[in-house]
A protein has these predicted regions:
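Flavin (primarily FAD) cofactor-binding/catalytic cores of flavoenzymes
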Residues: 2-45, 75-416
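Redox-cofactor-proximal catalytic regions of oxidoreductases
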Residues: 41-66, 251
Length: 416
């Protein structure tokens, strides 16, 4: 089988891979993008039916193409987002090959660069960009055994309330996915329990500006790490039903029963940490901190934005917060499904290079790996807070492309 060569091979054709291709093309760097499924596959198949983007259309896009059929302040649905990326890839003429799985990347023998083994043959590339993003492999906590008498699924496999087994549902995880799915299930008439861990809960909008705008105005997109994200916590923000602040007290008053972090399972009973009150309080403080910072910014800039006193009001504490549930017999509670909205983990098993620490996490600086010629793109906090978002990965891709130009100049040097 013939070996195909290129300068840069990009793995993944989601938002990161497409952004990378645009910048490589602009700098006339030969490259190929390999995608094991379809363009923007995660948006097409690993999302539930009612999902919308977490940011408004004016913000959650690449600079050179708008959502022409979506109001700038609206939140496009998952299928529209998938179509946006397909349209963008076509617009820039991205050299994407779909249905090609990258199985192994390792150093080439006796020559610079990397040998890439795929389902469609062998490629040789001087550089490889891992643009597979943060949503690689569903993460399941090892708590409830697979043979327990309850149906279990990950949020990436959830589509709508009708697919779930009869009975109540425990949603574990309170980020954008868990909070939206819990509300959707409650509105569908299900009894819902929501396991709430540490989270960052900003206002969806405040004083006529969306939270994405406030992130930019306050310089928070550029933070290397959010002040409240000393370690990973759930990001509770959603564009669900036109965009509304995630408020767990409001969900409780709708009928959702809040519990703390899911800790253990024994003989049909789940045990929860006694941390619900603290987790809710810390989420509240993050929310009010944004309001305080926004008010100070408006005053400092002399902006004419009307006050929003109702944003400072808080729902009364529900009973489940006053007297938290610490254990739950699944059978007695009638729970037929546990839905794990517990995020994803990385899988770089195909990348056989010295670019990872002892925990298997990528070693890099702004996406430039410790291994010469290997790059990472689209990971959370790669460069700053924006890096895993559409807005941010495009900027990071430009930095990586510029670095590749410099490396190509070194490669091309010959002594006069």
């Amino acid at each position: 089988m013939a070996v195909e060569t290129t300068d840069t091979l990009v793995v993944g054709a989601g938002q990161s891979g497409i952004a990378m291709s645009e910048h490589l093309s602009a700098l006339k760097i030969p490259h190929i993008v390999l995608e094991r499924s379809r363009i923007a596959e995660n948006w097409s198949s690993m999302r539930w039916d009612s999902l919308v983007a977490n940011g408004p259309a004016w913000h959650d896009r690449f600079p050179n193409l708008t959502f022409e059929d979506v109001h700038p302040d609206a939140f496009p649905g998952k299928d529209r987002v998938a179509r946006y990326f397909n349209d963008y890839a076509a617009m820039i003429g991205a050299p994407i090959r779909t249905g090609v799985e990258v199985r192994l990347v390792r150093h080439s023998q006796g020559r610079p660069g990397y040998t890439v083994t795929t389902s469609d043959g062998i490629f040789e590339a001087r550089r490889v960009v891992a643009a597979t993003g943060p949503f690689q492999v569903p993460s399941f906590p090892d708590i409830v055994p697979g043979d327990a008498a309850v149906h279990q699924l990950h949020s990436s496999a959830y589509k709508n309330p009708g697919q779930l087994a009869d009975g109540a549902v425990l949603v574990v995880g309170c980020g954008a996915s868990g909070s939206q799915i819990a509300e959707e299930l409650c509105k569908a008439g299900r009894q819902v329990y929501l396991s709430v861990g540490e989270h960052y809960r900003p206002p969806r909008a405040y004083r006529q500006r969306d939270y994405c705008w406030w992130l930019g105005a306050l310089g928070l997109w550029d933070e290397v790490k959010s002040k409240r994200k000393k370690r990973h916590v759930a990001f509770a923000v959603s564009g669900y039903e036109g965009g509304r602040t995630v408020d767990f007290r409001r969900l409780a008053h709708m009928g959702v029963t809040l519990v703390g972090v899911t800790r253990a399972y024994e003989n049909g009973t789940l045990h929860f940490a006694d941390d619900l009150v603290r987790n809710i309080a810390e989420g509240d403080e993050a929310y009010f901190e944004v309001l305080r910072d926004a008010d100070a910014y408006i005053a400092r800039k002399g902006m004419d934005l009307p006050p929003e006193p109702e944003a400072w009001q808080r729902y009364e504490d529900p009973g489940c917060l006053k007297e938290p549930i610490l254990s739950l017999d699944l059978d007695r509670a009638g729970i037929g499904t546990i839905l794990w909205a517990t995020g994803f983990r990385y899988d770089f098993s195909w990348l056989d290079v010295d670019a990872f620490d002892e925990q298997g996490m990528p070693l890099h600086k702004r996406g430039v790996s410790a291994e010469n010629g290997i790059y990472f793109l689209g990971l959370p906090d790669l460069t700053n807070r924006a890096s895993a978002f559409i807005y941010g990965c495009w900027q990071d891709a430009k930095h990586i492309a510029d670095h590749i130009v410099i490396q190509r100049n070194y490669d091309a040097y010959t002594r006069a």
